[in-house]
Amino acid sequence: MPIGVPKVPFRSPGEEDASWVDVYNRLYRERLLFLGQEVDSEISNQLIGLMVYLSIEDDTKDLYLFINSPGGWVIPGVAIYDTMQFVRPDVHTICMGLAASMGSFILVGGEITKRLAFPHARVMIHQPASSFYEAQTGEFLLEAEELLKLRETLTKVYGQRTGKPLWVVSEDMERDVFMSATEAQAHGIIDLVAVE
């Protein structure tokens, strides 16, 4: 029998009695955000809304984005990345488990010096892929052109954020490259490995 999302007590400032809220809402109030699924428009919009709201609420307190994601759609992932760059508070990114594909792109988008992975986390980078393999030739060519533009954008961002030359990043993105937390640190995707 599923238990659903656990509830925890939360007392708003100035209130005597605590109310029960789901654990994620409680953590959001502490500026702790979670990407624990495939990146799609729905989770992207939720995270963007939370980052903007929390930034407006208090632009001096940092945000913390915990990532355990197999990746997902490019455009919603880039939207999360762009929002992280746009909001005034620093966004710490923390990889727990897996940050693959767009998950690693969002991970590298955290404030430089504030990107972290747990010791046994895995990070994977690769080039963006197409979902339209059975499209007509004309549609396929248009999509291929768009994919090349997206790949160029992602390569530039990885290069800027990691300090690696573009040719190194481009070469790494040719195939799935899995890294340990230590390897991701050496690659410049994260800055610190959490101590066990």
From Swiss-Prot:
Compartment list: Plastid, Chloroplast stroma
Key word Plastid present: yes
Protein name: ATP-dependent Clp protease proteolytic subunit
InterPro entries tied to this protein: ClpP, ClpP/crotonase-like_dom_sf, ClpP/TepA, ClpP_His_AS, ClpP_Ser_AS
Subunit and partners: Component of the chloroplastic Clp protease core complex.
Source domain of life: Eukaryota
GO MF: ATP-dependent peptidase activity; ATPase binding; serine-type endopeptidase activity
Protein family membership: Belongs to the peptidase S14 family.
GO biological process annotation, one example: protein quality control for misfolded or incompletely synthesized proteins
Main location: plastid
EC number: 3.4.21.92
Gene that this sequence comes from: clpP
HAMAP family given in the database record: ClpP
Catalyses which reaction(s): Hydrolysis of proteins to small peptides in the presence of ATP and magnesium. alpha-casein is the usual test substrate. In the absence of ATP, only oligopeptides shorter than five residues are hydrolyzed (such as succinyl-Leu-Tyr-|-NHMec, and Leu-Tyr-Leu-|-Tyr-Trp, in which cleavage of the -Tyr-|-Leu- and -Tyr-|-Trp bonds also occurs)
GO CC entries: chloroplast stroma; endopeptidase Clp complex
Keywords: Chloroplast, Hydrolase, Plastid, Protease, Serine protease
Pfam families assigned: CLP_protease
Active site: S101, H126
Enzyme type, top EC level: hydrolase
Role, per record: Cleaves peptides in various proteins in a process that requires ATP hydrolysis. Has a chymotrypsin-like activity. Plays a major role in the degradation of misfolded proteins.
The keyword Hydrolase is assigned to this record: yes
